[in-house]
Every structure is written in C-alpha cells, then in structure tokens.
C-alpha cells in the first residue's frame, strides 16, 4: 500500500491513480499540489510542498509487485523502467526493507512510499486511496486484498499476478505469498503430512492471518488449491497424497 506524510491531510483522504503515481516515481510530478493530483482530489486542500519519493534500496518482492503495477498503468514507466525486484529508480530515497521505508515516511513531511499493509498499520502510517481497474477509488483493506484473489483466473497457474485486477472493491497492488511443493514426492509419507498441515492452516488460519494484518484466501481459491493437490501431487506410483 501507499504510505504518505502530508501535513494537514487525514489518512485515506488523498486519492491517486496509476498514471499519476507512476509520474511521481518517474520524478515528473514534484509537488503535492500538481494539477494531476488536484484533479483527482476536488475539494481537498493540497499543500504546495515538495514530494519526497521513498523506494526500496534493496531487492524485494514488494518492489517487484509495485513496479509490475506501475508497468501496467503507466506507459512511460513500462518503457523506461519496467518491472523487477530491483530496477534503475529514476528518483527517490532508498530505504532498506519495509521498516526502512516506513521510517523515512514517518520522518519526512511530504513523503510517499510503498510498504506492506502490516507495516503501515502497525506504524500508524497514513494511506492513500488508489483508483482501481474499474475506475473507482479503493482503500487498502483485508477485504479489498481478498477481492483481488477472488476474481483472478487461477485455472492455469497459482503463481498469479494480482495487480490491477478488475472487480468491485479490489485494491490494485495486491500479491500472494505462495509455497512450492514437488508434484512427484520421493517421500510420500512426509509429503502427505505437509499437505495435512496446509489443509489445517486453510481451515484454521484465517483469524491468525487477519490478526497479523494479512488477508486470507477466499474459499473459492482454497478449493481450487485442494483440487490441484488431488490431481497433481503423487507418489512414485502415481497415487495421490491428498
């Protein structure tokens, strides 16, 4: 999610869209009262303050997700910078880890940075709304993250890119954490126990995930995962382990 430190603005009061966000990270938009931002925020008094862009100094999955989103919604970003866990950033201060970005945003008036939702919530950072693929401002919440997973097509791969998904109340910069399991299990007893554990986690882990400020997978996605276990994960004789 996008964390900001803009004096006079409340959390969730500012709205950005992908094109404008990309232009901020390209260094083209330099002040918070730029016309592109004011058009998205009628009635909001924006300060004539320099934007302090904050990004990751180290390689990260968070940067991969963020830049993948920008490459989808900003053509200039796609052609000049692209997507990756590390990129040649056009501008910005580099923070190490989510905590490094959070610390910069907290200290610097006018700052904007991208962090995991949990870091922003636990550090009481103000957030922006973001215009979704459906053209509506959306707030970052566990529900809007789950909605991104709910509407995705998981039929071909579970390594889904959930950025800029269409649907009602979908946060456009969403990603999943996933686990790799060998389809052919050389130690089937251990493999079966691993699947039992993850099955237990799906049944019982939603509250723990939410308590840690993560979103749980929607039921329809979990059922697709279980179906894949039944058809794909087998022992050396071709017997299913789940």
Each language-model region and where it sits:
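Flexible loop/hinge segments at secondary-structure junctions
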Residues: 1-242
């Amino acid at each position: 999610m996008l964390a900001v430190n803009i004096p006079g603005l409340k959390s969730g009061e500012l709205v950005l869209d992908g094109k404008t966000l990309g232009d901020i990270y390209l260094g083209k938009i330099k002040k918070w009262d730029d016309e592109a931002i004011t058009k998205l925020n009628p009635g909001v008094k924006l300060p004539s303050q320099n934007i302090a862009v904050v990004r990751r100094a180290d390689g990260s999955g968070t940067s991969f997700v963020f830049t993948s989103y920008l490459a989808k919604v900003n053509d200039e970003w796609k052609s000049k910078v692209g997507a990756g866990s590390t990129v040649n950033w056009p501008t910005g201060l580099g923070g190490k880890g989510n905590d490094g970005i959070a610390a910069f945003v907290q200290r610097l008036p006018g700052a904007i940075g991208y962090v995991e939702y949990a870091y922003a919530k636990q550090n009481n950072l103000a957030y922006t709304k973001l215009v979704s693929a459906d053209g509506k401002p959306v707030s970052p919440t566990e529900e809007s993250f789950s909605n991104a997973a709910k509407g995705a097509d998981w039929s071909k791969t579970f390594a889904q890119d959930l950025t800029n998904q269409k649907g009602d109340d979908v946060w456009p910069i969403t990603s999943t954490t996933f686990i790799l399991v060998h389809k052919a299990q050389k130690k089937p007893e251990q493999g079966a126990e691993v699947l039992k554990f993850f099955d237990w986690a799906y049944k019982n882990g939603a509250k723990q995930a939410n308590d840690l400020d993560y979103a749980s997978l929607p039921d329809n996605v979990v059922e697709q995962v279980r179906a894949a276990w039944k058809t794909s994960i087998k022992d050396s004789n071709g017997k299913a382990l789940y």
